[in-house]
Amino acid sequence: MMSKIVAIQGDHLSKLNPITDTSIFLANEIQNKNYKIFYYKPENLSVINSKIFAEGFFIKFNYNKKIFFKILKKQKLNLTKCKFILIRQDPPFNLEYISTTYILETIKDKVKIINDPTSIRNISEKLYSIKFLRYMPNTIFSQNIDEIKKFFRKNDRVVLKPIHTFGGNDIHLLDKFDLKFIKKFIKKHDHIICQKYLSKIYKGDKRVFLINGKIAGVISRVPKKGSFLSNMGKGAKAVNTKLTRIEKKISVLVAKNLKKENIFFAGIDFIDEKLNGDINVTSPTGLKTFYDLSKINLAKTFWEELKA
């Protein structure tokens, strides 16, 4: 029988920052509705006798304590006993990540899983943006040196990005074509993204939260002095902002596409009214930061849309 249990598949609790973490923010909201929170790491997911189990802990989150969680009970839980499962571990989107989507996929008709594991597997966070290239800065996806060299000739400054990392990791701004560096970068990452640098990033990007196919909110993230990276983990500062008419139009289009793909919760980013190509569906963040700025609780919206 299904119980009022929300399972969270996430990174080690020691990696979570209660001041900003979206997983904790979502868990705190739903535990106030008398749901139990079961937390486990991806490596503790197993298939035993055709049933899906996870070894983890029933926990209680508390924002007011120095230690922000209390372990109530360790347990091996049959995940079909849950009402919801949140896939919340950070990328890299590697074989272990993919394996968990195959395992959870087998029970998605019995338990509501956010985001849908099949959809997470099918939607590469950066490659999916190929559908929306007309709304992006000049961008190519390639590991062909000649094509990359041509791209540099047409664009003064170029941002190089890996396809399967996250959080602004290993992103570089090049003022000119550097064969040695680019060869090394390709050897490490295979296909890479080359994108025209948009100088207005110094004013900040915009992170748009999409919930159940609709625009739910937006914040701006301003890079720290001397940086072009707008990720909070790289020292950027969050501020209130609004979407322009163009950004709203593009956001609605992306949101509708993602809903068709069974993506319930996502984050997309704009720089100077252009999508930057990151369509975050694995573990979208920023809801707690948005609440701190606006006092609008999108965790409440999240669970209301799920009819929890």
Model-predicted regions and their roles:
Residues I145-D146, R153-D156, H164-L258:
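Phosphate-binding site of ATP-dependent enzymes
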Residues P117-R121, I215, R221-K224, I271-L275:
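Short glycine-enriched loops at secondary-structure junctions
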Residues V158-L160, I192-Q195, F264-D269:
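A short linear hydrophobic-aromatic micro-motif
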Residues S14-F141:
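Conserved N-proximal alpha/beta basic substrate-recognition cap immediately N-terminal to
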Residues H12, Q89-P92, I163-T165, P284:
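Short glycine-rich anion-binding loops that position phosphate/pyrophosphate groups of nucleotides
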